């Protein structure tokens, strides 16, 4: 696997020099300063590429080129936004970048309720608490119809949870959910947030699938002409939330996506931390079945909690519910399969998220993207990969 690291650009507290010391060789980056929908010019792409290459690193993957909300709803200027997206892809390819991660999650990117969940060892992790989220939906946002998404027991627990919250805790929970996490391009007020949700009224899972298929059908000719691979990131968490449909959550969703848009340029990001939240997602099976479409991997683990099957926290990279040993083995199997047919390029992998620990506990960091936790994760995955290669792949 190609060892990569997500970098949020010149304002990231983790510098490119830090990343070099971590042992990564590839950078995962995006032009976050360009508003959603606008074309990324070659000038801006090359400017960022030069900064990365000056340190001896490679801009391996774009994560992400954001998909404008009007593309997802097929309203307003959606065709113009698609045309802009196509031009951005052309520009990236012509600047030598050929792998683009994106997602098709409505309104929100990845979602957590707690950004400082304390682990037994004192480090801090990200957490999604189903009851806290229910309290937000039912009693803070007061989304119409939200009751249908929760059991009577969950509703009672959510009310108790809400009644015990201080005003500061209400503000913090609201901010955690709607203010935009790292990599998300939008932040909202409560009123703006509900207005965004309302735009999806009447858009079912099947309808959102239609919109995604149309979007990809427009992009594939550009991707095929330039050899540019798209790698869709799964929903996080991988299930419907806030009354919104989710369409990249299961192996059945991947089956549909690859059958509907069969071009090999229509690929996947295997994010084990997102897919792995669901106990019914067999990650190794997913990799073995759709390995040829996997162009990017995010390796991390989550732990489902006993209090509620929908509640989870981000575990250490080799702990939790993800069988990282067999996941990495399956990825290495796919790399070997490719090498046997002449494709020796390694699959880009980044240690996704990491616990805030040690000296980083005293620093301001991007949630999930502190340096030391990811350094630990990268080292662990690197060691696992080396052991597997020595044991099973050395001829």
From Swiss-Prot:
Cofactor list: Fe(2+); Mn(2+)
Annotated InterPro entries: Man_deHydtase (IPR004628), Xyl_isomerase-like_sf (IPR036237)
Catalytic activity: D-mannonate = 2-dehydro-3-deoxy-D-gluconate + H2O
PANTHER family: MANNONATE DEHYDRATASE
Keywords from the UniProt entry: Iron, Lyase, Manganese
Family: Belongs to the mannonate dehydratase family.
Entry EC no(s): 4.2.1.8
Domain of life of the organism encoding this protein: Bacteria
Gene from which the chain derives: uxuA
Protein name per UniProt: Mannonate dehydratase
Top-tier EC class: lyase
Pfam family, one: UxuA
Function: Catalyzes the dehydration of D-mannonate.
One annotated GO biological process: D-glucuronate catabolic process
Gene Ontology molecular function terms on file: ferrous iron binding; manganese ion binding; mannonate dehydratase activity
UniProt keyword Manganese present: yes
Lineage: Bacteria, Pseudomonadati, Pseudomonadota, Gammaproteobacteria, Vibrionales
This protein's pathway: Carbohydrate metabolism; pentose and glucuronate interconversion
